[in-house]
Amino acid sequence: MVVPSRVVVVAAPKLVGTGPIQSVAELADYPWLQEIGTNEATRYLEQNGVTKGIRKGLISLPGNLMIDAARDGQGVATLARAFIEADIAAGRLRVLFADDERAGYFLVTPEGVLRPAAKAFAQWVMRQAAAGLGAGY
């Protein structure tokens, strides 16, 4: 695993406030953000009993825009904590729920010897990860 990270449900305090949120169902009145090509938000809602969907809709965005939209208070998002640790520490995002499952990102390469450029890239990725990207796990 290159970057270990729990999946967290987050939102900007200006969207959900600072008070306690006891269940995922309480978030059904907010728009939810989901990365294009994934089903993490939909799956999280279903796993937590919110099967009828959300009243303000599910907005699909590219990953970088999803994080920006969450910071801006445009919706609730399920994200890898490692990529938003600074936002959490600064108070721009609030962790509402955290998944207990250990998850993360892997670097997958084909079997056999890597070409020099691919090997250099893989080594760079590993150095970047070792420099602290996964420190928020």
Predicted regions located by residue number:
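Short leucine-rich amphipathic alpha-helices used at interfaces
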Residues: R43, L61, E111-G112, A117
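C-terminal regulatory
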Residues: M1-Q74, A82-G104, A130-Y137
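Short amphipathic alpha-helical coupling segments at ligand-binding clamshell hinges
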Residues: V113-R127, L133
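Short alpha-helical linear motifs
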Residues: G104-Y105, W124
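Short beta-strand-to-loop capping motifs
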Residues: A11, T109-E111
